[in-house]
Amino acid sequence: MGRSRSRSSSRSKHSKTSKHSKKRSRSRSRSRDRERKRRSKSRESKRNRRRESRSRSRSNTATSRRDRERAASPPERIDIFGRALSKRSAVDEKQKKEEEEKKVEMERQRRIRQQEIEERLIEEETARRVEELVAKRVEEELEKRKDEIEREVLRRVEEAKRIMEKQLLEELERQRHAELAAQKAREEEEKSKREELEKILVDNNRKIADAQAKLAEDQLRIVEEQRKIHEERMKLEQERQKQQKEEQKMILGKGKSRPKLSFSLKASE
């Protein structure tokens, strides 16, 4: 168990160190890019200033050369007889002088280019050394502050964890309240429906009771009417029988009131 814990802790430290080293390398690369851009801009501005100075010096040199040629050009020479001498020697001297000046100018331009190349090499070497020095200083500073950076990272991780836990608890509490509110709403709805059904059931029971009472009343009325009809029939039957008896009595009474017939036999002689 101890070995596994030490291995996991070493792996976590190694992963953290690798992450820090990657971050440091990215920051160093970004700082190097910015430094290169700044130096390239400064070199470009210096070159532009040199070109402007060279162009001004060239224009000044050409102007001064023309002035010198005008001042150095000898007057037209004549012989003892007043004839103009040939200008070939003067032209040759002028061409020779121009060639010498051109050589001097070319040498000057070569020296300027050589100086620019040397300055550029010096600037590049200086920039490289400065960059290496800055990277070394940054590496040393990061190495010195490694423990502090790790503690800060752990602190921020713990703080982010606490914030996430708090947000999660708040979200769970909101969900719980929402579920309770929904459950209460469902219970209220079910209670309302139940009360409505009970009300409907009571109303139906009342209607059924009223209908049953009315039906019982109707049945009693029908029974009473049937009893009355039966009594009426019995009464009519009794009256009919009574009348029939009276009629029979009358018929029988009439028979009794007739003269009696005598059926006597005479004596034979």
Curated annotation (Swiss-Prot):
Q: Name one Pfam family in it.
A: ARGLU
* Keyword Transport (UniProt): no
The entry's cellular-component GO terms read:
chromosome; mitochondrion; nuclear speck; nucleoplasm
Region (Disordered) spans which residues?
A: 1-109, 233-269
Annotated segments matching region Necessary and sufficient for RNA binding:
1-70
Q: GO:BP terms for this protein?
A: mRNA processing; regulation of alternative mRNA splicing, via spliceosome; RNA splicing
- The annotated regions of Basic residues compositional bias extend over 1-57
Disruption phenotype annotation = Morpholino-mediated knockdown produces embryos with expanded brain ventricles and a curved body axis. Embryos have imparied movement without lethality up to day 9 post fertilization, after which they die due to an inability to feed.
Compositionally biased, Basic and acidic residues: which spans? Answer: 64-80, 89-109, 233-249
> Where is this protein primarily located?
nucleus
At the top level, the lineage of the source is: Eukaryota
Q: Does the keyword Nucleus apply?
A: yes
Q: Where in the cell is it found?
A: Nucleus; Nucleus speckle; Chromosome
A GO molecular-function annotation:
transcription coactivator activity
User: Which family does the UniProt entry place this protein in?
Assistant: Belongs to the ARGLU1 family.
Q: In UniProt terms, what function does this protein have?
A: Dual function regulator of gene expression; regulator of transcription and modulator of alternative splicing. General coactivator of nuclear receptor-induced gene expression.
Q: What is written about domains in the entry's comments?
A: The N-terminal region can bind RNA; preferentially binds 5'-CGG[AG]GG-3' motifs. The non-classical LXXLL motifs are not required for nuclear receptor coactivator activity.
UniProt name for this protein: Arginine and glutamate-rich protein 1-B
Q: Which organism is it from?
A: Danio rerio (Zebrafish)
